């Protein structure tokens, strides 16, 4: 079994701009500056890359599973331009306030539950990779991302893009290992310890 370090990433507000509603099409998907570069750098440094995202707009009838998958496919197309991609993508379609007969069985996968992370770890194990949690990270813009990562035994980074819930984390006494301005700084400045100059 090969040891693997993994970068688990939230999507909206971390990789792409939070537009104030569910992203339902490629046209609404706008990369945050240098997010794709950050993912490529992490891949070059030996990280497996896994997407973990809540998409409750599905249960609410605002977006469809196909919409979410199309947007994720588009993201992978953008990453392919940098010769990188996600190893796996997971999303939770459920929401406790919007019961849906098709999606309610996934409610316990919703972040901050670590179920999607644990599923990814199990799937990678089936492929011959044993995830080293002590060398793996969860990066997101919300309190639930930090909590999810911590519950899965990962190091956590909160980014100030998107919702920027730094003060909310403090209120709930849930502290990430690091706070970064954006995904690029999180990867290069903290995980890899490289200079973060944008020149």
Curated annotation (Swiss-Prot):
Protein residues bound to substrate: 10-12, 18-22, 53-56, 110-111, 142
Site (Contributes to substrate recognition): 110
UniProt KW Metal-binding keyword: yes
Cofactor(s) needed: Mg(2+); Zn(2+)
Alphabetical UniProt keywords: Carbohydrate metabolism, Cytoplasm, Hydrolase, Magnesium, Metal-binding, Zinc
Any GO CC annotation of this UniProt entry: cytoplasm
Entry EC no(s): 3.1.3.-
Entry's family note: Belongs to the GmhB family.
PANTHER family: D-GLYCERO-BETA-D-MANNO-HEPTOSE-1,7-BISPHOSPHATE 7-PHOSPHATASE
Designated name of the protein: D-glycero-D-manno-heptose-1,7-bisphosphate 7-phosphatase
Originating organism: Chlorobaculum tepidum (strain ATCC 49652 / DSM 12025 / NBRC 103806 / TLS)
Organism classification: Bacteria, Pseudomonadati, Chlorobiota, Chlorobiia, Chlorobiales
């Amino acid at each position: 079994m090969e040891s693997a370090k993994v970068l688990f990433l939230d999507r909206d507000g971390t990789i792409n701009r939070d537009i104030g509603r569910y992203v339902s099409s490629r046209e609404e998907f706008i990369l945050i500056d240098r997010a794709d570069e950050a993912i490529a750098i992490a891949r070059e440094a030996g990280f497996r890359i896994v997407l973990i995202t809540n998409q409750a707009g599905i249960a609410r009838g605002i977006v469809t599973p196909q919409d979410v998958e199309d947007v994720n496919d588009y993201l992978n197309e953008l990453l392919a331009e940098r010769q990188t991609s996600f190893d796996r993508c997971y999303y939770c379609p459920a929401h406790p306030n919007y019961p849906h007969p098709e999606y309610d069985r996934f409610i316990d996968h919703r972040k901050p539950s670590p179920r999607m992370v644990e599923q990814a770890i199990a799937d990678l194990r089936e492929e011959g990779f044993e995830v080293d949690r002590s060398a793996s990270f969860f990066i997101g813009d919300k309190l639930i991302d930090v909590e999810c990562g911590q519950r899965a035994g990962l190091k956590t980074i909160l980014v100030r893009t998107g919702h920027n819930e730094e003060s909310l984390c403090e209120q709930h006494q849930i502290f990430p290992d690091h706070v970064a301005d954006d995904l690029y700084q999180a990867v290069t400045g903290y995980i890899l310890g490289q200079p973060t100059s944008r020149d």
